[in-house]
Amino acid sequence: MILLVFEGKKREPELFAAIERLGLFKPGRIICSFCSDIQSLHKRVKELEGGVEGAADMVQLLQVARRNDPDDLIHTMTSDDISEIYLFFDSDLHNSRYRLAEQVERLDELLSLLGNEQEYGKLYISYPMIEAICHTKELPDAKFEGYCSLIRDGKKFKDKASKFSPYNSLDFLIPQDERKRDEVRSNWSHLVRQHRAKAQRLCEVSAKDHLTQKKLFQAQCDKHITPNGEVAILASIPLFLYDYFKEEKRKELGFSLEE
C-alpha cells in the first residue's frame, strides 16, 4: 500500500483523484492529510525521534497528528501495511514564527531524513506553495523557467497565481467533462515536463539524471533564497510524477524529456 501524506485536506487530494481518473497514477493508496505546515512536521519528527535521528515512525507520527479524528484511515494502519510513503508540503518560507535561516535549516534537516519512500518517507516540496501548479500561462509555457516569487509575498501568491493563469481555477487539471479528458491529460503532460525541465536546469543536471529534492532545495538556496529572497516557482506533484515512473512509462504518458 502506498501512503500519500498531504499538507492540506482539499486541493492536493482532489488533484491526485484527478490524476488517477486520467490513468496517470495507479490506484491502491491511502491518503492522510497532515493539516498543518512543514514547520509543524519538523517539530513532530523531532519530538518522536527523542534525540535519535531516524527513530520516529511516520505512521505513528500521523496517528498522533490525527488523534482528534478517530475515523481517519491512518488509525487502521501499521508501518508493515505501507510499502512506500510520499509527503507533499509547501516550503512556506514566509512563516513569521521563525527567522528565514531557521526555516531553511529545518527544511534541510527534513529533506536529509525524508529522502527514501521505502524507509521513513520521501518529501516533495512546492515553492512557494501548492498553488505553484496553477502559475502558468497557456500550456506549454515557454517562459515558465523564469518565473520566481518573492518570499515576503507569502500567502499573496495564491491570488497572484490565480490571476496569472488563463485557466479557470483547477479546471484545466481536473476533468469536469469527459469530453475534455484528453485535453486535461495533455495539460498534465505539459506541466510535468515544464516543471522537471525547470528543476533540472536549476540543478544543472540532465533528464536522465536522478534529481533529489535535497539537491533541488540546495539549488533554490544558492540561486534564489539566499541571494534574492525569492524562490523559483515549482510544484511538488509534477516533479513526483516524473520521478515515480521509469523512462519507458514516461514516454507512454507523455512525460519524457529524453530525446
Locations of regions flagged by a protein language model:
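Extreme N-terminal starter segment of soluble prokaryotic enzymes
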Residues: 1-3
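Short beta-strand/turn micro-motifs composed of small residues
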Residues: 6-7, 89
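Short acidic, Gly/Ser-rich segments with clustered Asp/Glu that frequently serve as metal-coordination loops
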Residues: 8-13
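C-terminal accessory helical subdomains adjacent to catalytic cores in phosphodiester-
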Residues: 14-38, 42-59, 63-259
